[in-house]
Amino acid sequence: MALGDPYATPDDLKARFDIATSDTVDDTRLGEALASVSREIEAYCERQFNTDASATARVFRPRSSGVVVVDDFHTTTGLVVATDEDGDGVYETTWDAADYQLEPLNGIVSGQSGWPFRRIVAVGSRPFRCDRRPSVQVTAEWGWAAVPAPVKEACLISAAEMFKLGDAPFGVAGFGEFGPVRVRMNSRAQSLLAPYRLHPVLVA
């Protein structure tokens, strides 16, 4: 799936309701629900899970002279790490692969494989330059190699709820004892997405 695509298809969602794939009456509403929920997942997790098929350049500020945290990228194919050595906005120095290490190592987080790279660690003699300007330019195929199964499931759970609610005006699903009940992300979906949040909320 390309960047910006929903994390599940209308046919996936139809299966939740035992709707035949040949029945296209609700395809528009199903697609809108999936697209809306997918963007909500991205906002909740502060990352996106699809794949950019071509390498593009992005710039970053290092956290220190030894580490720069970047957006998720899933392959070293087309990867270029370059730095601006004098703060002029020109990334004139291209690093050799031996100059840096990509993390998480082996694409494993908490025992689960399939995670993209997100940190670049300087392991040679060359440090990252820390400045007000972004001093590191990374050209990469951004995103994940595949949408994680829990993310797809969270998308389907929430999209199914949204589809069943229909056109809830102003996000109001109904009225309870204390007033209007607002539509919010399903708690099961939140649980599935918890490991993928960049900045999880800590509860004391």
Give, region by region, the residue ranges found by the protein language model:
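Divalent metal-cofactor coordination and adjacent catalytic microenvironments
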Residues: 1-204
